[in-house]
Amino acid sequence: MTDLEKPSITGHMFDVVVIGGGISGLAAAKLLSEYKINVLVLEARDRVGGRTYTVRNEHVKWVDVGGAYVGPTQNRILRLSKELGIETYKVNVNERLVQYVKGKTYPFRGAFPPVWNPLAYLDYNNLWRTMDDMGKEIPVDAPWQARHAEEWDKITMKDLIDKICWTKTAREFAYLFVNINVTSEPHEVSALWFLWYVRQCGGTSRIFSVTNGGQERKFVGGSGQISEQIMVLLGDKVKLSSPVTYIDQTDDNIIIETLNHEHYECKYVISAIPPVLTAKIHFKPELPPERNQLIQRLPMGAVIKCMVYYKEAFWKKKDYCGCMIIEDEEAPISITLDDTKPDGSMPAIMGFILARKAERLAKLHKDIRKRKICELYAKVLGSQEALSPVHYEEKNWCEEQYSGGCYTAYFPPGIMTLYGRVIRQPVGRIYFAGTETATQWSGYMEGAVEAGERAAREVLNALGKVAKKDIWVQEPESKDVPALEITHTFLERNLPSVPGLLKITGFSTSVALLCFVLYKFKQPQS
């Protein structure tokens, strides 16, 4: 028993109890244990990992059915995984990517599909430039303080896209961009929140790219190893199948009760679960009004992650890498990536069923989803081999009661400016982690590590172990996965938008017409 503790009425006394055994909670517990803090992790599921989950069987060896991707500028998760001896490998984009739109397949290379229509090109260019420029106005640690926060928080991303885009081509791709990045619909999410989300991931190119972007790499053996290995380090300080139902901090010691009626005491609590899931916990005293309102207003995104396995990577015979961007309302999958193992074994394509499509297709039998996906791949890749998979894995995150969805919680219009400032505010001796509370790569594993370690340092500060100025720590860049600067050409920076072009051409036409009239007027009359 440390000098922090008073006699326990439960016999289970700890300095800190962490609620949630995902990457965020376990990163917090690991850091606390390194300071010799007596910590316990309570995890609701019968496994650790949270929204990361590595399935292992003879058909797949291992497969990440949850969070999997990591890339440059995600320095905390790269540092943590390296410390645990987990290596990364690059997602294959050596061959051509594919865009499928209006029933046709268009191969391309690079982060974004090329656009041949001049007006659509101007529209695309202006869309990405405008989103990035708006994002630069938003403080990553306090988006509610942005100069236009109130204005942007009142509208949805659909409203903003419809305002920015003049062509149907750019508008529909922008809708898909929202679906892919936050597994939600453009009409559901606040423009302020989405612009902040893209900004804190490094901008439109960084968040969407494979090479030099958020999807550049995966972990050899699966991302689930991160949580599993931290659990091994913590030993018996991680308890599974222990959903927390009650927290009482009215006395010197906080009392925690689980669903199976086990009781624990501690001095501090770190909640490392999605905000909406804290509504499953009874608090005494009750949560402050703003916190209580916030947790009721942050829905989770909707996604089904699907992996189709084949005898061989047949798509490579056509010089395709396996990445498909699919713009088709009837298509189950919106985006894919090659999910073949780094040694070339277990050829597979990973695809996401996103947002409205996840809700719709979840009603079908698994075999029907599998068939629809294979038929889609056959059509997009132009190969009947897609119809003959050897195995299929999927994970519907909407049915996970201890996640509520994936990838992350989103802010509907009006919520960020009204309640966003309390997302990280402690409630008494309860501190908040979880990827939603991060300021860099929120929604990703990187954000989970940032949030967990920051919450741990907040507790360490309360315990007198670290100074207040050391709660927020700047992470050095990974030497193994350095980030390349994202640059834009002179034309990309300076090309006009479609309305800008119309103004220019309209003015030019008017001047030419005026000159013609003046010329005619000055001619001698016969």
From Swiss-Prot:
Site (Important for catalytic activity): C374
Catalysed reaction, written as an equation: a secondary aliphatic amine + O2 + H2O = a primary amine + an aldehyde + H2O2; a primary methyl amine + O2 + H2O = an aldehyde + H2O2 + NH4(+); serotonin + O2 + H2O = (5-hydroxyindol-3-yl)acetaldehyde + H2O2 + NH4(+); (R)-adrenaline + O2 + H2O = (R)-3,4-dihydroxymandelaldehyde + methylamine + H2O2
Compartments in which it is found: Mitochondrion outer membrane
Topology, Cytoplasmic side: 1-497
This enzyme's EC code(s): 1.4.3.21, 1.4.3.4
Modified residues annotated as N-acetylmethionine in this record: M1
Similarity section: Belongs to the flavin monoamine oxidase family.
Purpose: Catalyzes the oxidative deamination of biogenic and xenobiotic amines and has important functions in the metabolism of neuroactive and vasoactive amines in the central nervous system and peripheral tissues. Preferentially oxidizes serotonin. Also catalyzes the oxidative deamination of kynuramine to 3-(2-aminophenyl)-3-oxopropanal that can spontaneously condense to 4-hydroxyquinoline.
Subunit relationships: Monomer, homo- or heterodimer (containing two subunits of similar size). Each subunit contains a covalently bound flavin. Enzymatically active as monomer.
Protein name, as recorded: Amine oxidase [flavin-containing] A
